[in-house]
From Swiss-Prot:
One of its GO terms (biological process) is UMP salvage. This is Uracil phosphoribosyltransferase. Binds 1 Mg(2+) ion per subunit. The magnesium is bound as Mg-PRPP. NCBIfam families: PRK00129.1, upp. It comes from Symbiobacterium thermophilum (strain DSM 24528 / JCM 14929 / IAM 14863 / T). GO terms for molecular function: GTP binding; magnesium ion binding; uracil phosphoribosyltransferase activity.
Amino acid sequence: MSRVVVIDHPLIQHKLSIIRDKDTGPKEFRELVNEIAMLMAYEVTRDLPTEEVEVDTPIARARCRRLAGEKLGLIPILRAGLGMVQGILSLYPTARVGHIGLYRDPDTLKPVEYYCKLPTDLGERELLVLDPMLATGGSVVASLDLIKRQGGRRIKLLCLIAAPEGVQAVQEAHPDVDIYLAALDEMLNEHAYIVPGLGDAGDRLFGTK
């Protein structure tokens, strides 16, 4: 079974309290989502391999550690996942970015793919799938299915807020994918919104509500 890691760093929790607030506007919301994603990335990437190198400082020669050539891929689930990309790229600017677009069929309520553009070397990369809200888990499970069909193997899921129902759905469908969260909330309501959540992340990011 995959691990569920709730990152309870004080800075993350402080910023999360602001984006939950219904009076926080799109500009501040976008900035804080990026900042939270960046802070979460520190924890998520702590197992990246390093190697010892020597460099010349102005004083003497020093032994240091650098990343050992690990390739990273970011895959935001459109559209809300876009809000998490820039914060992580600011830490790891050489990461490749793919995109997956899904919508929910109004009759079947199942996710339908409308866009997919992924790096061609998925199997060589550690992949971070980005979606601010893990509600029912349907879109995330469908995205992970698609990524694995195209060769992705080493995958981690980053979400700001999740409902227990979504976590369970991902764990049952993809027990090899670890899940990193800023908060695990109480439940879903009858409209499949996370309670207490923060509303529709996409609408709040892009000011479309």
